[in-house]
Amino acid sequence: MVLLISYDLNGHERPEAYDDVAHVIRTNAISYRKPLYSQWFVETNESCQSWHEKIKAVTDTNDHWFICPVGSTRQGWLPNETWDWLNART
């Protein structure tokens, strides 16, 4: 399964907050692509709820994130290697 994870870390005085989320994704995903600054496509066997809990553990209450499965109906303008990666997994 491929999940889309998108987030906005609000009001952080810690620049490493984005690094904390990236570390969670890199260490828990089977594979991933990061086409935009705070957006990831994650290949995983875990649920959206499981990923929610992982991200919640390294963020603050004023942060926002969105997680959803990626299906075959989609459009966008992303690098070709991202499309190739998505097409191979969905």
For the regions a protein language model found, what residue spans apply to each?
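C-terminal structural segments of small proteins and small subunits
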Residues: 59-89
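Short, flexible beta-strand-to-coil junctions
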Residues: 9-12, 70-72
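Short, intrinsically disordered low-complexity segments
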Residues: 27-71
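Short glycine-/aliphatic-rich beta-strand segments at the starts of folded cytosolic domains
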Residues: 1-9
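Loop/helix-junction capping segments adjacent to catalytic residues or to phosphate/diphosphate-binding pockets
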Residues: 12-15, 49, 76
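C-terminal end-helix/capping segment
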Residues: 23, 31-33, 81-85
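Short amphipathic alpha-helix segments
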Residues: 10-25
